[in-house]
Amino acid sequence: MTDRVLPEQIRNFGIIAHVDHGKSTLADRILQLTGAVSDRDMREQYLDRLYIERERGITIKSQAVTLQWDCDATQYVLNMVDTPGHVDFTYEVSRSLAACEAAVILVDATQGVEAQTLANLHLAIENNLLIIPVLSKVDLPSADVEGATLELSEVLECRVEDVMHVSGKTGYGVKELLDLIVRKAPPPKGDVTSAPRALIFDSIYDSYRGVVTYVKMCDGTIRVGDKIRMMSTGAEHTLLEVGVSNPEPQSRHSLSVGEVGYFITGVKDVRKSRVGDTITTDTHTATVPLPGYSNPKPMVFSGIYPLNGNEYSALREGLDRLKLSDASIVYTPETSAALGFGFRCGFLGLLHMEIVSERLNREFGLATISTAPSVAYEITPDGEKTLVVMNPSDFPSGKIKEIKEPTVKVSILSPKEYIGSIMELCQARRGVMQGIEYFGSVRAELIYVMPLAEIVFDFFDSLKSRTKGYASFDYNPEGSQPADLVKVDILLQGNKVDAFSAIVHSSKAYSYGSSISKRLSELIPRQQFEVPIQAAIGSRVVARETIRAVRKDVVAKCYGGDITRKRKLLEKQKQGKARMKLIGRVEVPQEVFVATLSSYK
């Protein structure tokens, strides 16, 4: 591949879709068709490099790859970005689309338009990208090609003939799609002669080469050996390697306007390559940075603790190393009386939280326990400043003037026959309906504003079970609203166990308290004395369960005689039990914490 490519011969495009709509399979066929990967080296989900991606069949990290394609007797360079589809990784999609001029919006012919399809479509429109509608999996017997084509054309307000039909499995229509991208997608704009400006759209950590920064060149040219400058921080580094992914790394002498590639400077801290920052050179310095985009804000918070208390420093090191490849993780040290030393971590969503825990286990051999997920509340105590509380243990005591909880705008796409059931579920979760829109004669989109706390537990599972798996949903931050919230503490023999504390709506305090008390009464081993388990709001107990004492049969040796002998032994036992209850401590096995907390994730 020659170093110098004219901007008119470059096409930058992304593939966006709902999870499991065939993005990675289509990307595989494109890699084969363009000759980037030989048939011998080809494997399924070629661009999904993380083992979790391959096991779960989902894309987590975006991948940018440079390909060559001949069309109309001219050779073009195609820069393709394969993006995630799950709602938790919308941020990955948004930053990848900043490197594109066109977006292939892919819809499964067997499923039709889904919630995340619409969310990603809005991202593409916000980035002023050319939209290319494509229907995938058209070769399947269950595909409703005609219905899905009509639905997609209605959503995009385009002609039915504009929707392309492809099959990533057989390769049908893929060549025609690439030709269409070349003919319809606009070439990148930029000035080759002006001061260099490159937009960072991703960065990953490589244990051998340090931070690999993925960039799109917007102006000028940057070469190996140049001293580059980060415009937000002013930090300077010498460029050791420049290249493109084809799809394996391929070093080049330089990158110029419109090209997508990578920079390596030998820096070991990925936080020095902030996504959205602009790179320039110190010899020909740009004065105005490119409009970047903000870092993702965590939506869900949870405490992560090592099962083995001696592995705290190993957990810190593991999180530090994960942060190098996943800049969206946020964590601060915290201490729990029940669980010891750990970290309060912020995640983009529940799937993100699950994947981080799994990576800590697989990559660093760390067995961890996660507390129940919570969100960030704004709490204003009487006469004091507003606090942001992410951990129930930090909930202030005393009189509270106002509590605000974060809300999200939820979009639910479902067949029309389940609308009543979905509305019932959303109302039970304190949702406020904003509108309903019908797509064709079969499907509808319901828009609700809901508290984020109501969807981080089991909303998705409940939605799927009520709609037999047909509904899909997506959400975006909407702001915050005042709410009647309380902190529920769980007490064992009068002592608070902070790991089980939760901030819940006052209407759900009893159900939370009674369910977790019942669960603990089933899991905690019986003691020599009676153990009360109480759920309390402040000093008011709202639910209680009791673990009955293990009782020795002290009168077994009495075979007859005076009844007073038996009474004396029973009275002595009763006094001993009372004394034991005063001084005894309830030992809660670690398995109880694991079992209880895992059931409330």
UniProtKB/Swiss-Prot annotation:
Keywords: Cell membrane, GTP-binding, Hydrolase, Membrane, Nucleotide-binding, Protein biosynthesis
Listed EC numbers: 3.6.5.n1
Any one of the GO BP annotations: positive regulation of translation
Superkingdom assignment: Bacteria
Pfam families recorded: EFG_C (PF00679), GTP_EFTU (PF00009), GTP_EFTU_D2 (PF03144), LepA_C (PF06421)
Catalytic activity: GTP + H2O = GDP + phosphate + H(+)
tr-type G domain location: 8-189
InterPro entries listed in its UniProt record: EF-4, EFG_III/V, EFG_V-like, EFTu-like_2, G_TR_CS, LepA_C_sf, LepA_CTD, LepA_IV
Name the record gives this protein: Elongation factor 4
